[in-house]
Amino acid sequence: MVKSHYICAGRLVRILRGPRQDRVGVIVDIVDANRVLVENPEDAKMWRHVQNLKNVEPLKYCVSVSRNCSAKALKDALASSKALEKYAKTRTAARVEAKKACAASTDFERYQLRVARRSRAHWARKVFDEKDAKTPVSWHKVALKKMQKKAAKMDSTEGAKRRMQKAIAARKAKK
């Protein structure tokens, strides 16, 4: 599905590259076909500036403001629509925050994370192996059940049912 987040005054955008990377702003005005004025009064580094459209990602949130509105009007519109709070709850915002936290982490924090991942993998493997020892899981059986389910949907004629029963009987006789 194609994203249809059109460029218009009031559209929230995320900066992709440069010193303001991953910051969110609002399109205040459209300069020409390639550039827009972007501002976020709640972020000190996002003062009103020109951004190239190749450098912004339009988000699905939009604020109702007029073109070239004042910073006060933009701040009021952002507060009333709560667009920044809605964006903060998205997966993209969480991913950006995680990336920032990972970049800001110390060597010891990265070591702790590595040890925690290794421990979690060990315990998951141990639990799976214990359950597998009690009731072995054959991936061939799982695949066979999936094939049977598909075949049951595909072949609903009497002849097909007989063929399926014959195959099942042959498999049981093999055991």
Swiss-Prot record:
GO terms for molecular function: RNA binding; structural constituent of ribosome. GO terms for cellular component: cytosolic large ribosomal subunit. Residues 152-161 have a biased composition (Basic and acidic residues). CDD domains: KOW_RPL14. Pfam families: KOW, Ribosomal_L14e. Keywords: Ribonucleoprotein, Ribosomal protein. Component of the large ribosomal subunit. The ribosome is a large ribonucleoprotein complex responsible for the synthesis of proteins in the cell. This is Large ribosomal subunit protein eL14. It comes from Leishmania donovani.
